[in-house]
């Protein structure tokens, strides 16, 4: 299975190729203007036809009987001559690409379209277009195609085809009550197959908008494959409706959204598997009532050629050469790799069959992991690449509650541009970015610059509290002094509240987490939430903990900070200064009577630790510690002892004589 990085590389190539074949904004605007103008002009033509038919009917009513006139009037009121105009093809599906911009509309008629109606619409359409716009259009009729061809006279050159059709053409052969409906066709009826194809294109457009438009990367992959069909003659027979069905089935059957590169690979896998070949599953047309194969018009040779080409394209993609499939130059790697300098003798030497890293690169301090880790840490600290608080956080601290608004979103799908704004003291600041988060950050930088605050890493903000500055500079002593002052102020009750607003962690004077250090001294403490105030942008939590009958409180922007503040207050009150010696718990080991009991108790203490102790196999027990002294390490509870010194055993230690005991067989199993 390929790695995610290779798919990301395919995504980059596909999106760059897509940007080259996607129409320019000027071309899209010209398409929109032309289609909208013709749609509005056809609406005016429909109104003109209705007015003309009403006038003709009014003149004929004087020569007919009353009953016949009423019957004719009620029959004519069934609907308009031109029912409506709909977009089909590339315009409706959004699949336009450069040098392939076929624009199509369907003009739905009440009755079966005839040549007479086609000529009438063609003659009146230029008049209605002139009323709407000053641009010049050439209008021609094409009886063989049952359509009207409209061309513009300026760049970019566009061609719009308006096809006449009617639902009666498809419904006339359907059975009603077991009998065929016999209808008399006019003598100048337009080509029936062209009208049926127009109705099918209308169904295809509705199906595509409902099923394929919502799939991620489906439209992008279709544009890429349409360009492939234009470039490679082998793929030309697949262009159109079958290609859209294959892409929808390939991408829509995945259980997760796919990127552009992975979606294109999935379509190629589907074609390379042989679904087009004889004996395969075929391609069902979902827009037909009867079971229909959408690939029935293709020959066996064409299907085999497309399958062979898809397999070759899939192999190129698997070896990271998708740029050959797209016919583009390879893009440089987004992550530069380390290059080694090779000598001429290494390249041209007969014995150097495989290139290797120079031996000198492996020497030095790189083999020492500790030195390498220290050097990397020094680089990170010296580069100052980590900012504890960016411009947006600083602005929210200075002016909490600011409302950021999205003004606009522009640009193509693969490279959007967001514009955000914020109102500060009646002044509106705007900035753009590739994402909403980046745009908000740019707006915050503008506001801070306008207010006179520096935005660099080294700059100090005057509105920051002393706690924030001390945390950013690594001075934990200031935090301790502030917490002790807050503790001393609350003498009216047995509780103490500590207010700490900081971006960094709260630590004790020894550099430990206050909650962890307090838990080492007093286990089983319970922290309770006292209050929660403030809005969503500036919440304040107050936590309380009870230690030795005294209650201590701490506040912070979240529960974790408030809990640490309460623990720090308890440590400062109970375990600092003169109170530290009185509150420390000493581990007392009872003195055993006699030399033997003393040795046994020392041996038990030596083997007791994390988990269950194991007996030694020797017949002698050596005394490694005296009563009251426990060596630090795994032989003590929790691995460390509060009564033992920091390193090793004390210099003055009572030495016990080695006692010899009778040995008993020790079983290799235990039920305890």
Curated annotation (Swiss-Prot):
Its main location: cytoplasm. GO terms for molecular function: DNA binding; double-stranded RNA binding; single-stranded RNA binding. The keyword DNA-binding applies. Keywords: Cytoplasm, Developmental protein, Differentiation, DNA-binding, Methylation, Repeat, RNA-binding, Spermatogenesis. Pfam families: dsrm, DZF_C, DZF_N. SUPFAM superfamilies: dsRNA-binding domain-like. GO terms for biological process: cell differentiation; spermatogenesis. InterPro entries: dsRBD_dom, DZF_dom, DZF_dom_C, DZF_dom_N, NT_sf, STRBP_DSRM_1. It is found in: Cytoplasm. It comes from the Eukaryota. Residues 357-371, 466-476 have a biased composition (Basic and acidic residues). One of its GO terms (cellular component) is cytoplasm. Residues 349-371, 465-498 are annotated as: Disordered. Residues 477-497 have a biased composition (Low complexity). Residues 5-363 form the DZF domain. Residues 387-453, 510-576 form the DRBM domain. The modification Asymmetric dimethylarginine is found at residues 612, 617. Involved in spermatogenesis and sperm function. Plays a role in regulation of cell growth. Binds to double-stranded DNA and RNA. Binds most efficiently to poly(I:C) RNA than to poly(dI:dC) DNA. Binds also to single-stranded poly(G) RNA. Binds non-specifically to the mRNA PRM1 3'-UTR and adenovirus VA RNA. Interacts with EIF2AK2. Associates with microtubules; it is unsure whether such interaction is direct or indirect. PANTHER family: SPERMATID PERINUCLEAR RNA-BINDING PROTEIN, ZINC FINGER RNA-BINDING PROTEIN. This is Spermatid perinuclear RNA-binding protein. It comes from Bos taurus (Bovine).
């Amino acid at each position: 299975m390929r790695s995610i990085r290779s798919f990301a590389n395919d995504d980059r190539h596909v999106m760059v190729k897509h940007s080259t074949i996607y129409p320019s904004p000027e071309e899209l605007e010209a398409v929109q203007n032309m289609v909208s103008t013709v749609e509005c002009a056809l609406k005016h033509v429909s109104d003109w036809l209705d007015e003309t038919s009403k006038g003709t009917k009014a003149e004929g009513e004087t020569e007919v009987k009353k009953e016949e006139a009423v019957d004719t009037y009620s029959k004519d009121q069934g609907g308009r001559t031109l029912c409506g105009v709909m977009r089909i093809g590339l315009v409706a599906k959004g699949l336009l690409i450069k040098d392939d911009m076929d624009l199509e509309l369907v003009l739905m008629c009440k009755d079966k379209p005839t040549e007479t109606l086609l000529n009438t619409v063609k003659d009146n359409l230029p008049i209605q277009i002139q009323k709407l716009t000053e641009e010049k259009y050439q209008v021609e009729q094409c009886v063989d195609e049952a359509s009207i061809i409209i061309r513009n006279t300026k760049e970019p050159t566009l061609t719009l085809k308006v096809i006449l059709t009617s639902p009666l053409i498809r419904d006339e052969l359907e059975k009603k009550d077991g009998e065929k409906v016999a209808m008399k066709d006019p003598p100048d009826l337009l080509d029936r197959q062209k009208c049926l194809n127009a109705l099918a294109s209308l169904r295809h457009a509705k199906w595509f908008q409902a099923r394929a438009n919502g799939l991620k990367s489906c439209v992008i992959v279709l544009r890429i494959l349409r360009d492939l069909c234009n470039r490679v003659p082998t793929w030309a027979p697949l262009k159109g409706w079958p290609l859209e069905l294959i892409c929808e089935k390939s991408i829509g059957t995945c259980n997760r959204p796919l990127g552009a590169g992975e979606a294109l690979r999935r379509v190629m896998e589907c074609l390379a598997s042989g679904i087009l070949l004889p004996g395969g599953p075929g391609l069902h047309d979902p827009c037909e009532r009867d079971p229909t194969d959408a690939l029935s018009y293709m020959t066996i040779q064409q299907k085999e050629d497309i399958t062979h080409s898809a397999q070759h394209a899939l192999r190129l993609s698997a070896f990271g050469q998708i740029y050959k499939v797209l016919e583009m130059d390879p893009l440089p790697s987004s992550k530069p790799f380390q290059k080694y300098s090779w000598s001429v003798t290494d390249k041209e030497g007969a014995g150097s069959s495989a290139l290797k890293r120079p031996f000198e690169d492996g020497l030095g301090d790189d083999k020492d992991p500790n030195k390498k880790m220290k050097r990397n840490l020094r680089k990170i600290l010296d580069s100052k690449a980590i900012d504890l608080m960016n411009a947006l956080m600083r602005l929210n601290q200075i002016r909490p509650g600011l409302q950021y608004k999205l003004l606009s979103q522009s640009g193509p799908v693969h490279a959007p541009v967001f514009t955000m704004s914020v109102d500060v003291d009646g002044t509106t600041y705007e900035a753009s970015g590739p994402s909403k988060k980046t745009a908000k950050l740019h707006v915050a930088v503008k506001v801070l610059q306008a207010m006179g605050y520096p935005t660099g890493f080294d700059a100090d903000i005057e509105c920051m509290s002393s706690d924030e500055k001390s945390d950013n500079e690594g001075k934990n002593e200031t935090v301790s002094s502030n917490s002790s002052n807050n503790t001393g102020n609350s003498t009216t009750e047995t509780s103490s509240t500590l207010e700490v607003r900081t971006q960094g962690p709260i630590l004790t004077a020894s550099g430990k987490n206050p909650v962890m250090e307090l838990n080492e001294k007093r286990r089983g403490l319970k922290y309770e939430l006292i209050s929660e105030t403030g809005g969503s942008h500036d919440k304040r939590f107050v936590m309380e903990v009870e230690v030795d009958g005294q209650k201590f409180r701490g506040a912070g922007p979240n529960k974790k900070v408030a809990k640490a503040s309460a623990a720090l207050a308890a440590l400062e009150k109970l375990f600092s200064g003169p109170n530290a010696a009185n509150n420390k718990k000493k581990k007392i080991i009872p003195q055993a009577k006699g030399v033997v009991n003393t040795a046994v108790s020392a041996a038990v203490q030596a083997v007791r630790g994390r988990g269950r102790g194991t007996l030694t196999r020797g017949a002698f027990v050596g005394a490694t510690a005296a009563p009251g002294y426990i060596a630090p390490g795994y032989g003590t509870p929790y691995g460390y002892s509060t009564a033992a010194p920091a390193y090793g055993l004390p210099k003055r230690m009572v030495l016990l004589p080695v006692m010899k005991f009778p040995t008993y067989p020790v079983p290799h199993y235990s039920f305890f």
